[in-house]
Regions:
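Low-complexity, intrinsically disordered segments enriched in Ser/Thr together with acidic residues
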Residues: 93-113
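Extracytoplasmic/periplasmic copper-protein system
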Residues: 20-29, 125-147
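Short, solvent-exposed loop/turn segments enriched in Ser/Thr/Gly
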Residues: 34-39, 100-101, 114-117
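Serine/threonine-enriched low-complexity regions used as flexible
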Residues: 113-127
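Hydrophobic h-region of N-terminal signal peptides that target proteins for export
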Residues: 10-18
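Bacterial N-terminal signal peptides that target proteins for export
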Residues: 1-6
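A surface/secretory-pathway sequence property marking extracellular, secreted
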Residues: 60-86, 133
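Low-complexity, serine/threonine/proline/glycine-rich extracellular segments that form mucin-like
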Residues: 27-67
């Protein structure tokens, strides 16, 4: 019975973790204020069809400096009037039962606080899953604590 409980708990945790996440390269959700950090966006496919586009909204105060090339994906960047990156879109295919990682370097805000990374995942049928905290229990955004 205990093995069943542990297996069930592990399975539930894996489902809870199966969403688009932004973490530091070391895999944490914490970083230092003003620090240059390498972040990774991890995007799993949760449907029986390919993901065709990923849109990442950059939190205010984060300064993106460069991206790692992601084979099979074209990247477009939107900047504000000051030249700061506000949004990144990657287009390509992530097939069912696959995931993709997108790495980028950024400088954290100098003030401590909470970064909310909003991710919009588009599937081949045009449907979009909004990992943006509009439904935190179902589609949570990724958060980074800047200390």
């Amino acid at each position: 019975m205990q093995k069943f409980f542990m297996l069930s708990a592990a399975l539930l945790l894996s489902f809870a973790a199966a969403h688009a996440t932004v973490r530091t390269e070391a895999g944490t959700s914490e970083s230092a204020a003003g620090k240059s950090e390498t972040y990774r966006l991890n995007v799993p496919v949760e449907k029986d069809m390919a993901t065709t586009q990923i849109r990442l909204v950059i939190p205010a105060g984060v300064g993106i400096s460069r991206f790692q090339v992601t084979p099979g994906f074209a990247r477009t960047v939107t900047k504000d009037a000051d030249g700061l990156v506000t949004e990144v879109v990657w287009k390509g295919d992530i097939e069912p039962m696959e995931y993709a990682r997108f790495f980028f370097q950024a400088v954290n805000p100098v003030q401590p606080g909470e970064l909310v990374w909003k991710v919009y995942q588009t599937y081949a049928d045009g449907s979009v899953v909004a990992w943006d905290d509009t439904q935190p229990d179902k589609t949570p955004a990724s958060h980074t604590t800047v200390k």
